[in-house]
């Protein structure tokens, strides 16, 4: 009935006479009461016995309807099946002149160590047997043509690509006039 009304919390529509005047018959005015009486829940419905089970006494742990779980573990004891099948691939180095060492080799990264008593992990297939795009070698000529096509060969000539645009916002910093049609600082 009053779904379309938006009332502030603590106000209610209750057919009550004003405190100083008696009710004027069945057409008593509906007034907004700023505070509800103790027996009403926000003035909208009478408060009776709470529904559902009684709350547990303080100091006890509530387990729900089925009681405590006898085999509760916060984390699964066995890893998911997909986690054991993943093979780690070496990532291409960021330094082109530096060769990568195989895992476990002196000077190279240490490989994953199996847990004591665990069976030895299966050997990884060679890179050429993967059949994926990650294993294909890219021709240097193809890289050079991409570099020229994308304009990456000019990176050394354009310091703003390294420093960011904010250092060259004003052309007065460069010591030359701005190009025609550009916005000045």
From Swiss-Prot:
GO terms for biological process: response to estrogen. Residues 15-64, 95-130 are annotated as: Disordered. It is found in: Nucleus; Cytoplasm. GO terms for molecular function: transcription coactivator activity. Pfam families: CITED. GO terms for cellular component: cytoplasm; nucleus. Keywords: Activator, Cytoplasm, Nucleus, Transcription, Transcription regulation. Interacts via its C-terminal region with the CH1 domain of CREBBP and EP300. Interacts with all TFAP2/AP-2 isoforms. Belongs to the CITED family. This is Cbp/p300-interacting transactivator 4.
